[in-house]
Amino acid sequence: MAKRSMNRLVKSLLSVMIAAPLGFGTMETQAETAPPVQEWSFDHEQPGVLPSQFFIGTMFDGRPAGEWQVLATDRAKSPPHVLAQVMAKGAEHAYKITLVKGIVAADLNLAVSFLPIQGQADMGGGLIWRAADDRNYYLARANPLEQNIRVYRVENGIRHLLQNFNQTIDVRRWHTLRVTHQGCRMNIFYDDKQVFDLCDKSFHDGMIGLWTKSDAVTYFDDLPLQHMKSTHTRQ
């Protein structure tokens, strides 16, 4: 009698394990409901022009904020194309900006790969997010000349430094900047290494974009955006 009861118990446990092995069923459900990723690789865009979904901001003196265009190059991270800022001149506070039309993101996971090409006054580039316009946004940027990574809050065209991280940046290879932002909490990664974890409550949502400064010429590639489900109330 005891043996039959034990056999029934074993069969019952086996049926549960087969139906939901090690909780993978739950993981699969989460994956199915994960927010989709929107990505710009620029590989199907026409070289020599700006992709139609992007627009160029305005510099402090009213001129277009850089010369942004798709380039065909064998230096692309994911060939054949990159999005490049090619204006190789500019004043100290000439911020070269391009933003994506029709995107309003609050909580997000955003990344881009960049390759520093040239620059004497400045070099490198960065990510813009939660942008109200081309003068109000968050910015994470990497500068090979200064050998650092910084995150800023930009208000009315003026940068306010939030944090600095000293980092060796090799100009001969591609690098990646990534930001996750939920509520006020932002985490920023450089080549998969976390460099910032901070809270700022200035901007709640907005556009995304790319950024360079002064005379920096930079290639950008593989720009993925994932809208994240909010776990915070607006603060």
Regions found by a protein language model. Give the residues of each.
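Short tryptophan-centered beta-strand motifs in secreted/extracellular beta-sheet-rich domains
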Residues: F42, L110-V112, R172-I188
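Predominantly extracellular/luminal carbohydrate-interaction, adhesion, and secreted-enzyme modules
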Residues: L127, K201-T218, R234-Q235
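Short, solvent-exposed beta-strand-to-loop segments that form ligand-recognition rims
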Residues: N166, F189-G209
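Short, aromatic/His-centered strand-loop micro-motif at the edge of beta-sheets
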Residues: E155-T176
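Beta-strand-rich interaction surfaces with strong enrichment in secreted/lumenal proteins
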Residues: Y95-I103, Q163-I169, G209-L210
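Secretory/extracellular carbohydrate-interaction modules
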Residues: P47, P80, Q85-R150, E155
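Extracellular carbohydrate-recognition regions
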Residues: A31-F60, D221-D222, T231-Q235
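Extracellular glycan-recognition surfaces and repeat-rich motifs
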Residues: V49-A84
